[in-house]
Amino acid sequence: MDPNCSCSTGGSCTCSSSCGCKNCKCTSCKKSCCSCCPVGCSKCAQGCVCKGASDKCTCCA
């Protein structure tokens, strides 16, 4: 059970608007959580919910 998520891993939850789930790996959640990319990175917004600003974003790799 994720302490920041109202469901157990693989269960049903919503992570669409915020990243309360640490890993956001519930089956009902279509997007994963990651750090926000710097302005100008178009890849980050796809399939990802931003959890905070970061200059080193793995979504951009």
From Swiss-Prot:
Binding sites annotated in the UniProt record for a divalent metal cation 7: 50, 57, 59-60
Keyword annotations: Acetylation, Metal-binding, Metal-thiolate cluster, Zinc
Region (Beta): 1-29
Chain's role: Metallothioneins have a high content of cysteine residues that bind various heavy metals; these proteins are transcriptionally regulated by both heavy metals and glucocorticoids.
Family the UniProt entry places it in: Belongs to the metallothionein superfamily. Type 1 family.
Domains: entry comment: Class I metallothioneins contain 2 metal-binding domains: four divalent ions are chelated within cluster A of the alpha domain and are coordinated via cysteinyl thiolate bridges to 11 cysteine ligands. Cluster B, the corresponding region within the beta domain, can ligate three divalent ions to 9 cysteines.
Full protein name: Metallothionein-1
Organism: Rattus norvegicus
